[in-house]
Amino acid sequence: MTVKTEAAKGTLTYSRMRGMVAILIAFMKQRRMGLNDFIQKIANNSYACKHPEVQSILKISQPQEPELMNANPSPPPSPSQQINLGPSSNPHAKPSDFHFLKVIGKGSFGKVLLARHKAEEVFYAVKVLQKKAILKKKEEKHIMSERNVLLKNVKHPFLVGLHFSFQTADKLYFVLDYINGGELFYHLQRERCFLEPRARFYAAEIASALGYLHSLNIVYRDLKPENILLDSQGHIVLTDFGLCKENIEHNSTTSTFCGTPEYLAPEVLHKQPYDRTVDWWCLGAVLYEMLYGLPPFYSRNTAEMYDNILNKPLQLKPNITNSARHLLEGLLQKDRTKRLGAKDDFMEIKSHVFFSLINWDDLINKKITPPFNPNVSGPNDLRHFDPEFTEEPVPNSIGKSPDSVLVTASVKEAAEAFLGFSYAPPTDSFL
């Protein structure tokens, strides 16, 4: 197979191919790093710290949202501040209600497991988080916010739904929809990029999900291929709402420095107040990656990548349509006030000529056949999950419901920090 690049129009040499592979491997590894770990790493690099943009970023002023920046957390919310969880007579779920079958994902605070409910014989994805790790990084308010956002997702087909949440003395459990078509990141790794019709379909479903969150005054803030799943039919499902910010109305802003390096909008890097349009920048970055194989301003040198995001003009190769080009230019506009979506939010995206072939009513009702079918044979088909996860043994402690727990100061602290976490749906819910 002949591969051509902008720099060399002929067949790639072995040395050039090795260089490309090295770039992609470095890119994948870096993508798996948390933002906090990345900032710590760059802060310890004396050469990187000399770069003016890095110096600017590291001099972060006092954030308005302390839970994401390792400041002292606010006192835990009182029961009256919690979302109404329905009739208190509903029984709480417990770990022993499930058969935990496979590890299918990992994160900063725990694991995601495929589990089958013993009584219902239904498969779920159960996100199990360690309270000790959450409290150590002072992220308890952040976790409660994720749970609150999940409770609002039940009415949209392209957002993962929460069925139960409960806790033991040392762990939190999110019982979620089980989605086994694989991460968009996984499919991009295998295929490198997508044809425009396929990219348009995914972008439309993603935009629909973001528009719904915005209608609830929620900004997603962490759109990236790792957080976009495909269901068994090939429709997208957004997951991981840990960086969502609630109560952001149309003209409201927030200022926390958070997100994933490759997808940070210029206003976030500048430490300026930002609004819902940060999600439309991320949509542009993901669409660009689907069409070209890498994020728009990517560099192995993170300081250089940040400088590209802030200062480098958007460069688009000629192998896309004019409508795709126009959409990318609108979404990846560095001035958020001029960005597509700044005035009428999702309606501007929806009415763009790039999506003129999309029937939005059919889209939301899943009447449009996805351009790619993951071809999973059933819930036990794990072909689209990373073997790094699925080959890992399931920890014995995850499925146990201890009859008694030694009450220590740390256990009491955890109980207070996650007050109101447990959730059982009311009888008229989506279950």
Curated annotation (Swiss-Prot):
Protein name, entry field: Serine/threonine-protein kinase Sgk1
Main location: cytoplasm
UniProt activity-regulation remark: Two specific sites, one in the kinase domain (Thr-256) and the other in the C-terminal regulatory region (Ser-422), need to be phosphorylated for its full activation. Phosphorylation at Ser-397 and Ser-401 are also essential for its activity. Activated by WNK1, WNK2, WNK3 and WNK4; which promote phosphorylation by mTORC2.
EC numbers: 2.7.11.1
Residue ranges of every copy of the Protein kinase domain listed in the record: 98-355
GO MF entries: ATP binding; calcium channel regulator activity; chloride channel regulator activity; potassium channel regulator activity; protein serine kinase activity; protein serine/threonine kinase activity; protein serine/threonine/tyrosine kinase activity; sodium channel regulator activity
Chain segments carrying region Disordered: 66-92
SMART domains: S_TK_X, S_TKc
Enzyme type, top EC level: transferase
